[in-house]
Structure formats: structure tokens, C-alpha cells
Amino acid sequence: MGKFLATLILFFQFCPLILGDYSPSCCTLTIGVSSYHSKPCNPAQPVCSWTLDLLALSADQALQPPCPNLVAYSSYHATYSLYLFPHWIKKPNRNGGGYYSASYSDPCSLKCPYLGCQSWTCPYTGAVSSPYWKFQQDVNFTQEVSRLNINLHFSKCGFPFSLLVDAPGYDPIWFLNTEPSQLPPTTPPLLPHSNLDHILEPSIPWKSKLLTLVQLTLQSTNYTCIVCIDRASLSTWHVLYSPNVSVPSSSSTPLLYPSLALPAPHLTLPFNWTHCFDPQIQAIVSSPCHNSLILPPFSLSPVPTLGSRSRRAVPVAVWLVSALAIGAGVAGGITGSMSLASGKSLLHEVDKDISQLTQAIVKNHKNLLKIAQYAAQNRRGLDLLFWEQGGLCKALQEQCCFLNITNSHVSMLQERPPLENRVLTGWGLNWDLGLSQWAREALQTGITLVALLLLVILAGPCILRQLRHLPSRVRYPHYSLINPESSL
């Protein structure tokens, strides 16, 4: 009877697991306030798949923009390619569990507030002890017009995880939080398919079309601004419509845009685009385009007017060079004198320490000699006691040991001259003219200052003459590429 009850208890314990292997399950995808269920996942092929509408995802973005002053384009821009995280980072804890963090870095190295931040990390809330996630090689996603297909492969169905998808060009990021659940009775409705028949492809590479974009920028500002392009991000985005962008007419400081949409309703398009985005109907149309170009971060500032000098600056340069030379010479002389004085004092202190160490070594050597004499005296006494047996060594049947203490090294240490006489502290010349040390150092400093002053007097006029004739040698070539009448 007891065996029957034990078998029955084990059957009821493992019955849900056995039945669960054959029952279909799916993953629920929560985005903001909406939930999306994946297709049924079975143990034979554990794959969770979603077909998501990008416009519905944009409407469900409940997070705040992650960066301050982030430029918001979600009200009038087209869809952009989505990027999943290329790798996962394992972060274990002390209890044997832990988290998986998904890490993503944008290849263009974008920084806030330019259309999103550079990198994001999101915790993976599954257990680390037995992870069923198979990392990046099992992530599959495609984008068809405004719909996104995501396929996540697992080694077992019904496992919770968290996923973060970053869409460059959108103001909020998407936090996709998934959890295992049973198949719902009815599939939640998605928004109807949008009329976005085409998406805007990324622009032609900058290697061949950068000059055309700069020309369009100059033409849109009527050739009154200087365009400075930041080479940190050499990539353009989409054709957008931004009628509220204004170019500064007169300003002392350039107006910096994190990303600028230049209005181009009456300009010839530099590239052949067959479809454009209409912000009024929120759709891609093939009618004449009234759009703009999105360029990387650059600054617009008025062209400065070059004024002629009213006075020559050569006397100022002469006085400036002379003052700098004299100041450098005085500072060098003072520094040299102080360094020589400090070197002398340092050598004196080191020599004093060496003499004390030498006295200590000599004293220890004398003590060692006394100990050796005491040992020899004891040895002679023991030899007399064991005279009949042939001495101490034969009585002990051991080899005789003798001391060999030399005094040559100690005598050489005592005969060495002082350290100040062995170290070269001056210029390597004999400056002993019957003067004191400070007088000799002052003489050396004066000679140095005179040499520097002579060098400035001899080489200064030649250098100033060359600098004066340098502006006349510079040529300003005229580039026809920025001519307003040139065709794009």
C-alpha cells in the first residue's frame, strides 16, 4: 500500500511536466501598455516568433527619452532599420545566479543628444545557472516595409527573458519585456497595415556624395554661412521635412545643431529619389518632394569679414620675443643656481651618511676580529686538553676549520676620497679662480644670460623678416565648386 501511494505521488508530481512537454506555449511581448503573443512554441522546434507593426510599436512607447534635449522625430519620420544587441554580458552574483546584460554600441559612435545615445545595457532576468538563451547566432529578424519579424530560438520553450531593441532615429527606446504564458484564446489585434509602401534607404556613401551635400547646404543658406562638418559621424539619415529650421543671419557665435534638416522645397535634389515622405498624410508618396536633408552634426556661422590692419605688429613681436628671452634666461639662471646649491647640499648629506656607514662597518670588523681571536684562543686551549689524542680535530674525528679574515676591503673603504671630490658638480671646467662657490655660480649664470641675449640679437631680426614676408607668399585658390551658379 505504501509503494502504491509513493508511485501515485510521483506520478502527480511529474504529470504536469510530461503534459507540459506536449502542450503548446508562447511568449507574451509587453510594449508599454500593449501585449503581443508569439506563435505557438513546441518542444520539437522551440522558436518564439512575432510579426510586429512598427507604427503600433511607436504608439506604445511609454518610456521617456533617455537623453536630455533629445531631438524628437517620431511625429514625422519614416521607419529605420532596427538593431538587436550583438552580444550578451554575463553578470553572476554570489548566490550562484545572476543576470545577462545585453550590450549595444552604435557603429557611428553617436552621442547625446544626436538621435539617441551611444550604448545601452539592459538586464537579462533569466537564471544564469541553466540558461536556455543561445546568444546572438540564434537571433533572427527581418524588416518588411513597416512590419518587423523577430524569431528567437531557445533550447526549451516557456523561458522568461528581457530584450532591448534600439531604433536609431526614434526618440524613446523600445524595452521589450517577455514572459512565458499559455496560448491565449484570441490573438490581440494589431493596427492595420500602413500605407508605407516603401522605406527610405540610407543615403549614398559620403565618399562620393559629400561635396554635393555641402553644396546643397551652401545653396540653401544663400552662400552666407560656413559649413563645418563633424567627421565623427560620416553618415546621413533620411529625407525629412522640417519647416521650422532657421539659419542664423547675424551672430557672433555659430549656432550648433545636433542634427539639422535643411529645407529644400525649391532646390534640385542631389540624388534620384523616387519616393518621399509627406508629413501631412504620414505616408510615402511619389509626388514632387518637399523635403529636406538630414546631415551629421555641423555648425552654421556667418562668413567673417576680413579687415585690414591699421598698424604693424612687428614692434610688438620684437618686444614680446625680447621679453620672453630675457625672462627665460633669468628663470634658467635662477633655476640653475638653486639646483647647484641643492646639489651641493645633497652631496654633503650623502657624504656624511657614507662616512657614518663606513665607521659602522669598521667597528663591526673590529668586533669580528675580537671574536675570531677569542675563538682561536679557545681552540688552542682545547688542543692542549686533547694533546694525548692528537688534538681536538682528531678527537672529534672531523676536519679542522680555520678563519680567513682579510682587512684589505675595509682599508680600501677608508682610503676612498670624499664624494664631493669624486662627483662632477659644475660644467666640467676648472672654475676655481680663488672665488667662493656662490661667486663661481653667479659668474656661470651671467655668462649664460649674455649668450642667450646675443643669440636673440643675432637670430631675432632674421626670423621676424621671414614672418613678415610669409603672408605675401600665401595664395588663396578659387574653388569653382562653391560657385552659386554651378549645377548640382
Swiss-Prot record:
Motif (CX6CC): 393-401
Positions of the UniProt region annotated as Immunosuppression: 376-392
GO CC annotations, alphabetized: host cell plasma membrane; membrane; viral envelope; virion membrane
UniProt lineage: Viruses, Riboviria, Pararnavirae, Artverviricota, Revtraviricetes
Chain segments carrying region Fusion peptide: 313-333
Extracellular domain ranges by topology: 21-442
Chain's role: The surface protein (SU) attaches the virus to the host cell by binding to its receptor. This interaction triggers the refolding of the transmembrane protein (TM) and is thought to activate its fusogenic potential by unmasking its fusion peptide. Fusion occurs at the host cell plasma membrane. The transmembrane protein (TM) acts as a class I viral fusion protein. Under the current model, the protein has at least 3 conformational states: pre-fusion native state, pre-hairpin intermediate state, and post-fusion hairpin state. During viral and target cell membrane fusion, the coiled coil regions (heptad repeats) assume a trimer-of-hairpins structure, positioning the fusion peptide in close proximity to the C-terminal region of the ectodomain. The formation of this structure appears to drive apposition and subsequent fusion of viral and target cell membranes.
The protein's assembly and partners: The mature envelope protein (Env) consists of a trimer of SU-TM heterodimers attached by a labile interchain disulfide bond.
Renumbered ranges of motif CXXC: 225-228
Keywords recorded for this protein, A-Z: Cleavage on pair of basic residues, Coiled coil, Disulfide bond, Fusion of virus membrane with host cell membrane, Fusion of virus membrane with host membrane, Glycoprotein, Host cell membrane, Host membrane, Host-virus interaction, Lipoprotein, Membrane, Palmitate, Signal, Transmembrane, Transmembrane helix, Viral attachment to host cell, Viral envelope protein, Viral penetration into host cytoplasm, Virion, Virus entry into host cell
Remaining remarks: HTLV-1 lineages are divided in four clades, A (Cosmopolitan), B (Central African group), C (Melanesian group) and D (New Central African group).
Official protein name in the record: Envelope glycoprotein gp62
GO terms under biological process: fusion of virus membrane with host plasma membrane; symbiont entry into host cell; virion attachment to host cell
Membrane topology, Cytoplasmic segments: 464-488
Disulfide bonds, paired cysteine numbers: C225-C228, C225-C401, C393-C400
Gene name of this polypeptide: env
Membrane-crossing segments per the record: 443-463
Source organism, top-level taxon: Viruses
Family annotation (Pfam families): TLV_coat
Site (Cleavage): R312, A313
PTM comment text: Specific enzymatic cleavages in vivo yield mature proteins. Envelope glycoproteins are synthesized as an inactive precursor that is N-glycosylated and processed likely by host cell furin or by a furin-like protease in the Golgi to yield the mature SU and TM proteins. The cleavage site between SU and TM requires the minimal sequence [KR]-X-[KR]-R. The CXXC motif is highly conserved across a broad range of retroviral envelope proteins. It is thought to participate in the formation of a labile disulfide bond possibly with the CX6CC motif present in the transmembrane protein. Isomerization of the intersubunit disulfide bond to an SU intrachain disulfide bond is thought to occur upon receptor recognition in order to allow membrane fusion.
